Amino acid sequence: MNATDSTFMGLLQAQVRNEFSASQQYIAVAVWFDAKDLPQLAAHFYRQSVEERNHAMMLVQYLLD
């Protein structure tokens, strides 16, 4: 593995962390809206969380393949 490959892999790993972090943040917001009895807003943020998790998992699959 050369320096360019190593840099690219590092950037991909950082993006995986960013995507999972965003997913967790969306869950936190969704839970807050759930606690405030705002189910439509909560549902929106739960969906966003799943979307971010799916982004992370696509990158993980790329790294594993």
Stretches with model-predicted labels:
Residues 1-65:
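Iron-associated oxidoreductase/ferritin-like identity signal
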